[in-house]
Amino acid sequence: MKIIAIAPRIGAAVLSLVAFSVMASTGERRSGAGSTFKVKFSDFQAYNYLIALNVILFVYSTVQLVMLVNSNHNSSFSSPFKWVLGVYICDQLLAFLLFSASSSAATASELSRHGLHNIWPPACATWKLWTFCSKAEAAVAMSFLSSFFIITSSILSGYHLSKVPAV
């Protein structure tokens, strides 16, 4: 059972680290109409939200991995039920928040790629920001995959919670 609990946490940690790293390196410089500008991930609130949640998930998953490997989850400062309940609540919260951040960033990427008829021009094509847009989309995809792993961890911690006697 321990391996089953560890695998999704490893997946969540690795993919959130990849999503964070790719998004943090997303930026592109363009020249046009006599001026030079740089587009960075930090210009988009949705991408900032995505980075913040992926960093939080990476730290949380890494701490959970260390505690699972060292079997310190039944520590003396808390009852097993309270500990498992806390893990379940954190897993649920992070799963919803990461899925929300990934959805927001996917919307920003979609608007950048295709625009919105008569309102928002397709930034990727208009300013030829192909590298920026491709890296942002890759980071969003990794974040969605990471959310799949934290959702799996949440399901497993819910199952574990149902097996621990309430005290």
Swiss-Prot record:
Residue intervals annotated with topology Cytoplasmic: 1-2, 70-80, 159-167
GO cellular component terms listed in the entry, alphabetical order: plasma membrane
Membrane topology: Multi-pass membrane protein
UniProt topological domain (Extracellular) ranges: 24-48, 102-137
Subcellular localization(s) per the UniProt record: Cell membrane
Keywords: Cell membrane, Membrane, Transmembrane, Transmembrane helix
Keyword Cell membrane among record annotations: yes
Record-annotated membrane-spanning stretches: 3-23, 49-69, 81-101, 138-158
Family listed: Belongs to the Casparian strip membrane proteins (CASP) family.
Subunit comment: Homodimer and heterodimers.
Name assigned to this protein: CASP-like protein 3
